[in-house]
């Protein structure tokens, strides 16, 4: 992350993040109603300084089912207070009495039934309430806040995607080069995600360095706002008209989540992607289809206020975007 470009320049001001669990609060928004009946117990919890997988294991143990029958929509930060849903596959079994559930760091908020598994990625997004300690109301920081509100921030994958000390990315590279075999299904998923995240970040950073993060280029692959539909800015498209649509947030620039067959986009992107042949071969071997991801992301309902202890941010991000990528554009987080 240190070498990736900024939409603006590197921030001047420093701040402290996650000094206390209350400094980083996340509320998950599934975006769909739960059915109230079905084979799955659906449990909404509030966890404090606990990781998602461990919390899910405790729920599965309480229900007397295998951890394989537990699922969730997304991994949440450990050093935080986070609200999220879990589904527990219990066909033909009654919902346990969760008022008897007693595990430090986990509070049961809501219990119901659902007719489907809550799958990874099956959420609308997350609400954030974050305190950046020691951040002062300088002219520079206010300017950054207003620019992030207007233009957005580079939609980078951050450290969570790559594992501790980049372990998942390191292993993905070794796997791609044939140095290791990976049989564990979860590890395969983590490593493939890290590999795609790395190439995406490099494409975005390269484009930012060229000053083209808000400019439609020939052969760009563009996303219709609010959808997962893409189209290409080929010779049939009017680039000036597309530029106007981009500025009105009707369409979004995208960067690749590599897969097979490879996508041909603008020349700048193609050049970066071509430097990662081993990863492209891995994607082909694993039958991973290509996808796109917005190059910039605008936080919804972004609000802020300066408090005696620092800067408080409140905003909503769609699933898959990282609050730490937004914060990176505002301040340098120090230990």
UniProtKB/Swiss-Prot annotation:
One GO process term, biological-process aspect: tRNA pseudouridine synthesis
InterPro entries: PsdUridine_synth_cat_dom_sf, PsdUridine_synth_TruD, PsdUridine_synth_TruD_CS, PsdUridine_synth_TruD_insert, TruD_catalytic, TruD_insert_sf, TruD_pseudoU_synthase
Sample GO molecular function, one term: tRNA pseudouridine(13) synthase activity
List of catalytic residues: 77
Residue intervals of the TRUD domain: 152-308
Reactions catalysed: uridine(13) in tRNA = pseudouridine(13) in tRNA
Keywords for this protein: Isomerase, tRNA processing
EC number(s) on file: 5.4.99.27
GO cellular component, one term: cytosol
Leader sequence segment: none
HAMAP family, alphabetized: TruD
Similarity section: Belongs to the pseudouridine synthase TruD family.
Entry function: Responsible for synthesis of pseudouridine from uracil-13 in transfer RNAs.
UniProt name for this protein: tRNA pseudouridine synthase D
Source species: Actinobacillus succinogenes (strain ATCC 55618 / DSM 22257 / CCUG 43843 / 130Z)
Gene that this sequence comes from: truD
